[in-house]
């Protein structure tokens, strides 16, 4: 990572406007890696799951050829949604495994909000609340993701 005093800097595809992996207007991933290399930053946060190749045999050499290392990545997934738990845990497994293979060391969890939650964001009085049972299931799902990350040598 580029170091400045006690600050370590890394770049991410999100810096290039890649907020969602499936956006048809995203720039080509190899172009983004070329531009990150040209910026002088030598460490990468992998950005939205699915934007960069998920095969470490493809992505690893692409990063290495540009002198880029991996810090980790984030999971922007519907952790809140009980019905999508299997999908979320699958993404956690795939993503943690990829980060491990690329010698990264962290996984950041970002809960993808529902339309209802977005509509009331910043308005505490009208925001939807989880009941106790949902809160317990949510926290258990977060713990499961943390366990998956830990089994891959990552901090979550």
Regions picked out by a protein language model, each given a short descriptive name:
Residues 1-106, 128-154:
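N-terminal pre-domain/capping segments
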Residues 117-133:
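Active-site gating loops and adjacent loop-to-helix segments of metal-dependent hydrolytic enzymes
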Residues 63, 110-115:
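Short glycine-enriched loops at secondary-structure junctions
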């Amino acid at each position: 990572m580029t170091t400045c005093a006690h600050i370590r800097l890394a770049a991410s595809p999100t810096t290039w406007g890649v907020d969602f992996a499936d956006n048809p207007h995203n720039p080509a991933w190899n172009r983004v890696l070329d531009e990150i290399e040209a910026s002088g930053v030598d460490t990468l946060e992998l950005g939205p799951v699915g934007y960069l190749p998920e095969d470490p045999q493809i992505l690893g050499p692409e990063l290495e050829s540009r002198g880029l290392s991996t810090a980790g990545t984030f999971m922007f997934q519907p952790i809140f949604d009980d019905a999508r738990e299997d999908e979320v845990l699958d993404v956690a497994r795939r993503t943690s495994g990829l980060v491990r293979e690329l010698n990264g060391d962290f996984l950041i969890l970002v809960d993808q909000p529902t339309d209802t939650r977005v509509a009331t964001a910043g308005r505490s009085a009208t925001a939807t609340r989880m009941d106790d049972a949902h809160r317990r299931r949510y926290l258990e799902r977060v713990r499961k993701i943390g366990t998956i990350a830990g089994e891959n040598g990552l901090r979550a």
